Amino acid sequence: MSQSPKVGFVSLGCPKALVDSEQIITQLRAEGYEISGTYDGADLVVVNTCGFIDEAVQESLDAIGEALTENGKVIVTGCLGAKSSASGSNLIEEVHPKVLAVTGPHAVGEVMQAVHSHLPKPHDPFVDLVPAAGIKLTPRHYAYLKISEGCNHRCTFCIIPSMRGDLVSRPVAEVMLEAENLFKSGVKELLVISQDTSAYGVDVKYRTGFWNGKPIKTRMTDLVAALGELAAQYGAWVRLHYVYPYPSVDEVIPLMAEGPFKGHVLPYLDVPFQHAHPDVLKRMKRPANAEKVLERVQKWREICPDLTIRSTFIAGFPGETEAQFETLLDFIREAELDRVGCFAYSPVEGATANELDGALPDDVREERRARFMEVAEEVSARRMQRKVGKTLKVLIDEVGNEGGIGRTAADAPEIDGVVYVEPAAKASKRYKVGDFVSVKITGADGHDLWGEV
């Protein structure tokens, strides 16, 4: 019996890219290819790239170079595949002319076509061995659910639309079927992702779809309600990411706070505010201003007191004055956002922000980022201390000799904090990866918690 052809895989970038990788690997396995964990054990290598910021571009180019050196046969896909060099040619092909093929992001068909060209698929693949939920690169107890591709916004600092195109929403029945299959496979936490989760359905004018005979609009609020109902059947969590601050977000908060979905649609919002001063937001082509956002945050917390808000910001954007930056710091103090990240503005090739006046020196941008994070960490530490003494539901991610590591409803994997859980004193309280356990919080710092079952 001949050996199945083997494909190595390198996945870089954000959760959206990870989902693309999962879809490609699922198709490879469905067609009978094996996935190799090493370069030398693979017949060829697929590298899924990121091209959002300069550091990501360099990391991707380095990964391609390593794969070429170690294996020699490389197919490249992902956001960097859609990027041109200064001369107008494909950047990857210019830097690494020996790659076999290059595609853009979200291109399963093109990647498979390239694989077939250089490594013909085996006969009679055992397609029934591939689970309905697909191949996942995350641990078995959580998974990402991508509901749309692309973005209709044209933020001046971002080049994602030029790489991934305008918004294309997945049919609601298709999303629900994938969610059900994931829950059936044992997933305890579903992380809803896209470039713009709030815009789900805009491109199809909120068309009504059907799931199990029930009508569901292709709209964020309706989808979240349907996912919450499904999650409740399996005792699972649904977490929302990349929620652009549309007015429609206000409709989701009650689903987190009360009724049958409470505890399943997590009181957690990942909202990329980016800044707080209206003039800076205007230059970014972003909505809102600090006063309106503060009012909304306060209203959200009135409705849902347990709400956790995560956000990202940019310090040192072109034209940002010291006074405008101070407005941002004041906003962070007043809004008391739970989890924040901040980037010192970095020019991205192809972004229209590069044409704006008032570019700031590198040291000023970095100094403002550092000051921002000092304030943010003070706020986070205060909010974390309020959890000491409470008993919280924790999803266990790891178990070792010294206890477990898990996350509360306030913590998304990889980007937020964790809970360090003491070893169970009694056999009846022992836990394993993927279990939900009640943990009494005994300590906290600015990021993480400590507790006991």
From Swiss-Prot:
* CDD domains the UniProt entry points to: Radical_SAM
Needed cofactors, names only, are: [4Fe-4S] cluster
Q: Which reaction does it catalyse?
A: L-aspartate(89)-[ribosomal protein uS12]-hydrogen + (sulfur carrier)-SH + AH2 + 2 S-adenosyl-L-methionine = 3-methylsulfanyl-L-aspartate(89)-[ribosomal protein uS12]-hydrogen + (sulfur carrier)-H + 5'-deoxyadenosine + L-methionine + A + S-adenosyl-L-homocysteine + 2 H(+)
- For this UniProt record, give its keywords in alphabetical order, as a comma-separated list: 4Fe-4S, Cytoplasm, Iron, Iron-sulfur, Metal-binding, S-adenosyl-L-methionine, Transferase
Q: Where does [4Fe-4S] cluster 1 bind?
A: 14, 50, 79
Give EC number(s), comma-separated. 2.8.4.4
Q: Name one GO cellular component term.
A: cytosol
Q: What GO molecular function annotation could you give as one example from this UniProt entry?
A: aspartic acid methylthiotransferase activity
**What is the UniProt remark on how the cofactor binds and its stoichiometry?**
Binds 2 [4Fe-4S] clusters. One cluster is coordinated with 3 cysteines and an exchangeable S-adenosyl-L-methionine.
- Looking at the record, the residues that make up the Radical SAM core domain are 137-382
Where it sits in the cell: the answer is: Cytoplasm
Q: Which GO terms describe its biological process?
A: tRNA modification
Residues annotated as domain TRAM: 385-453
Q: Where does [4Fe-4S] cluster 2 bind?
A: 151, 155, 158
Member of which family?
Belongs to the methylthiotransferase family. RimO subfamily.
Quote the NCBIfam families the UniProt record gives: 30S ribosomal protein S12 methylthiotransferase RimO (TIGR01125), MiaB/RimO family radical SAM methylthiotransferase (TIGR00089)
Free-text function comment from the UniProt entry? Catalyzes the methylthiolation of an aspartic acid residue of ribosomal protein uS12.
Q: What is this protein called?
A: Ribosomal protein uS12 methylthiotransferase RimO
Can you name the source organism?
Burkholderia vietnamiensis (strain G4 / LMG 22486) (Burkholderia cepacia (strain R1808))
